[in-house]
Amino acid sequence: MKTDIKNTIVLGEPGSGKTSCIAINETIDALKQGHSLFVNDNSKEEIYKSTYDLAKSQGYNIILLDYLNYKGDSFNCLDLVKDYYQENESVLCGELISLISEALNKPVKGSEDPFWTISSTTYIKGIIYYLLETKSKKISLEALSHLCVESSARIEFLGLGRSTPMASSLLNGVFTNSEKTTASILMTAFATISSILTNSKIKRITRTTSFDIRKIPKEKTIIYLKYPEYSEQYDGLVSLFLTELIHVLYHSCDQTGQLDIPFHFIIDEFAHFRLPSFERYISTARSRNIQFTLLIQSMDQLEIGYSKPVAKTIMDCCQNIISFQTTNYNTLTYMSQLSGYRDTVGHLPRVSMNDLLKLRPFEAFCLINHQPSIQLFKPYFMRRDYL
């Protein structure tokens, strides 16, 4: 199947038209083209309500991860790790454990020293391996949380030895620190995991997985993920699922070169989610029949979430840049510079910051295939073909 795969980044303040003009329209188009999708929806559930019937009528395999109402499918990020371990896929197992541990650990705010984040990540890797190597019946975020408490109360509880080689290698390095330092590392890891498991309903829907994530690359699938965007406690859950899904899709490409069914990620509030090595994934996405549409509020938001160098790489990997209404100075400056200059003497931008400030609702500055323009977008509910 030939398809025009391009990555897109969309900027704009809340209510400027990012969802109605881009996210929902691209979802509708992808469904009509037979592409698989991931879409995250906010508390308004606008994307889900606007596209579910179309997805159903097109015969899609529909997966619903509902962290708003706690209905639909369940997802345990460690189920695939366990499968890899039991299948003796040590390389894939190790890679996914590393990705999950990194996705869980956001850098400690206010600290420029990476020691705590690195140490906490190492500890989480170690206790995941410990659960695997001791053949624990329960392997989940909840089990990790319990193990953090038990091992911090009495390190000898773990009983590390020859039967736990990977866990011993990782955890002994943590436990050789001073008692105070070790306690702080364990506290950081526990706080990281427990910040996700904030109620009994989340614990319940993260104990098992109700679908086979490895079948997603082979079936026409749409994944709806609903979550309350106003609460950062759910950012970790979204990050974990996206991290694992991207891992699965890319390793499916390792066998075939590219996906037979193109896959489209439409990720709203992208800057809130910590996706390890994302800049590497997006730089090679198009050749694998994978595309990303990333919706953010401003350049500042992206740089805070991913650092300036990574944010620049992500922007450079997006062939389409669309900027709706915003008052963010850095975003206005960046977009004005992207528009190019009218002459080589005065360096007058083709689109000034003042022009960008005058954008109306649903109107956006666009850089499509390196060509700047200002376009008026049509929201999904004004489409003639909208059901």
Residue ranges and their predicted role:
Residues 380:
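Short, surface-exposed polybasic-aromatic patches that bind anionic ligands, especially phosphate groups
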